[in-house]
A protein has these predicted regions:
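Active-site histidine-acidic residue metal-binding/catalytic motifs
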Residues: 84-178
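N-terminal low-complexity, Pro/Thr-rich disordered segments
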Residues: 17-21, 31-95
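Glycine-rich, flexible loop segments associated with nucleotide phosphate handling
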Residues: 22, 127-129, 136, 221-229
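Secretory-pathway/luminal and periplasmic proteins that interact with or process carbohydrate-rich
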Residues: 34, 105-107, 244
Length: 312
């Protein structure tokens, strides 16, 4: 995870309808779906440089590095202009923005990503490095891999898919630009792909929903309900497709968590959620996250949830 360095705030009560719907899916999909809440669950900070992280660090960075303030006028969102006609399918005419969390080269640009940007209700770091498994598989590599799989699945159904980045930038994008890409694309849905960095024993996935936030440039009042629907659909299909249980340390067994401190959600004007696919610091979760077959299932679960949401 470490999409920011703050500890998640006190959890809010979930709407009964959302929790009930997910519980029904869980009962039919996987035993032991409702895990116990662990209030001690916290995010790790920056990724520890393991073997893969060290390899990433040795890669050459861009000769000219734009500052976070200049990032909105930087690179075009990846996939903004499809090079081939999309197939006709159930999602034809729909736009989905996929936001791969972090960037593999963020750790080479700590000065730039630590600069503060406006998130409407305050200021936060442009971006963070993300976490990694203990063996060094970086979250930023995981998020790109799953995002590519998800893009392919959605495009096969006719959706226009835009990535906020595709390992084609020296760092970032900053969290405010990530939100802006979704807004300017007039996305029907935005999904930010992540993996958590919590303590050993904390297992499972969770979906982060935007809280009702209004202040400065942030106003989520028009997307809270639709984002909750999107998140519940993704959570239910994620359980069904991957066989993974919802988080046992966040969300009270629902797989859903609401936060008002994330710029990527606060600044969104279109339905948006974050998906934390598992805990990279737990060996059992890490074994799943590093398995290509499981990552394909994770992408399929998200694609099915997005499609169910868009089809109503």
């Amino acid at each position: 995870m470490p999409y920011d360095d703050s500890v998640p705030p006190t959890r809010r009560a979930r709407p009964l309808l959302v929790a009930t719907a997910l519980a029904a899916l869980c009962l039919t999909a996987v035993a032991g779906c409702g895990g116990a809440q662990d209030p001690a669950g916290t995010d790790s900070g920056a990724a520890k440089p393991g073997p893969e992280a060290e390899a990433t660090a040795s890669a050459s960075a861009s000769a000219s590095t734009p500052s976070p303030e200049a990032s909105p006028t930087g690179a075009q969102p990846s996939g903004a202009t499809p090079t081939a006609p999309l197939p006709q399918g159930p999602l034809t005419g729909r736009t989905v923005v996929i936001d791969p969390g972090h960037n593999p080269r963020n750790r080479e640009h700590t000065k730039e990503i630590n600069q503060q940007v406006d998130i409407g209700t305050g200021r936060k770091e442009c971006d963070t490095t993300g976490t990694s498994t203990n063996a060094g598989y970086a979250e930023a590599r995981f998020t790109l891999d799953v995002s590519h799989r998800l893009r392919e699945l959605l495009q096969a159904q006719g959706a226009r898919v835009v990535l906020t980045h595709d390992d084609d930038r020296p760092f970032g994008p900053c969290i405010d630009e990530r939100a802006r890409i979704g807004n300017e694309a007039k996305a029907d849905a935005v999904v930010s792909v992540h993996a958590d960095g919590s303590a050993v024993g904390n297992r499972g996935f969770h979906v982060i929903l935007p809280a009702a936030v209004k202040g400065g440039g942030a106003d989520t009042s028009k997307i809270v309900k639709s984002s909750a629907d999107l998140g519940a659909r993704i959570a239910g299909h994620f359980v069904r497709t991957t066989g993974s249980a919802p988080s046992n340390y966040i969300g009270g067994g629902t797989g859903l968590d609401t936060r008002g401190d994330l710029g990527g959600l606060n600044l969104s004007t279109v339905p948006k959620v974050f998906v934390e696919c598992g805990n990279m610091r737990d060996p059992e979760d890490a074994a799943l996250l590093t398995d290509a077959g499981w990552r394909q299932k994770a992408a399929q679960g998200m694609a099915d949830g997005i499609a169910a949401y868009l089809k109503g």
